[in-house]
Amino acid sequence: MAAAETGRRPHIPVLLRPLLAAVAPVSGVWLDGTFGAGGYARGLLEAGADRVIGVDRDPLALEMAQDWAGAYGDRLRLVAGTFSQLDVHAGEPLDGVVLDLGVSSMQLDQADRGFSFQKDGPLDMRMSQQGESAADLVNEASEETLADILYHYGEERASRRIARAIVEARAAGPITRTLHLAEIVARCLPRPKPGQMHPATRSFQAIRIAVNAEFSELVEGLEAAERALKPGGRLAVVTFHSLEDRIVKRFLQLRSGGEGQGNRYAPETRAEAARFTLPLRRAISPDEAELADNPRARSARLRVGVRTDAPAGPVDPQVLGMPLIPKKGRR
């Protein structure tokens, strides 16, 4: 969940202080692959980075940054694009890469972006504002494909029940609003107890991941970071749910010479030269003070790797435990 600003006061990025501590000393050229409202980029510049390249696929994020980015002069360069191509966007070896995954607070808080199940808006969910929207997917995908997306990308146990309800609802007319979809999902699940998450949480996560191809983007981004980082360069990744954290954890384990497989069905892997070392024994989570200030940070996890001089190479997404959903066409 990339950090953002709400318009009332600056929102401090999740895990910023522990991230800066974990990658210290900060110097040279860094790339923030999920620029958002620029919180990490500013943190890196203030911590000592000579220059920061800010990459974001959301044109609105880069547009909003124009109000303050000029104050940093040529120390901050903004690029419209995806972090899966971060090595191309950088155009030079990097001393560090930061990735803050998922949807931003800014995107969640703007109802017209269609990410929120608590605010009525068009069923969109496109980070780049281009390509297939959530409404396209929900109204055109087959029931089987919808069920697979909900189960594999949202870990939703009631995936088949929800997919059936969506298909039945769209038969009466297109599903085009966020609250309409949230209501359909909620009717399929027990009423949550106080303090429990909204019943549409997992379904909205799954559809968003599918619309934005977030898992393939993540795997390609990790490979791109490996190619771009200098020996000694730092890779810091903040995740917000178990599926993406599993991919990052497995990538760093494999690339640091760790053994074992992501799951028993994954192909066997042979030992290779370590491309990263791991300065942290385990992932870092927000402390109580940060959670009190930002409850959305509860599921955040920070993982860090330090690049070695071993040559970069491709990685098999299946070995990383990336869910693969076969294309089954439209209804």
UniProtKB/Swiss-Prot annotation:
Chain segments annotated as coiled-coil in the UniProt record: none
InterPro entries from the UniProt entry: RsmH, SAM-dep_MeTrfase_MraW_recog, SAM-dependent_MTases_sf
Binding site for S-adenosyl-L-methionine: G38, G39, Y40, D56, F83, D100, Q107
Entry's EC annotation: 2.1.1.199
Reactions that this protein is recorded to catalyse: cytidine(1402) in 16S rRNA + S-adenosyl-L-methionine = N(4)-methylcytidine(1402) in 16S rRNA + S-adenosyl-L-homocysteine + H(+)
Gene3D superfamilies: Putative methyltransferase TM0872, insert domain (1.10.150.170), Vaccinia Virus protein VP39 (3.40.50.150)
PANTHER family: 12S RRNA N4-METHYLCYTIDINE METHYLTRANSFERASE, S-ADENOSYL-METHYLTRANSFERASE MRAW
Principal location class: cytoplasm
Leader sequence residues: none
Subcellular location, record wording: Cytoplasm
Record's GO cellular component terms: cytoplasm
Protein name: Ribosomal RNA small subunit methyltransferase H
Name of the top EC class for this enzyme: transferase
Region (Disordered): 308-331
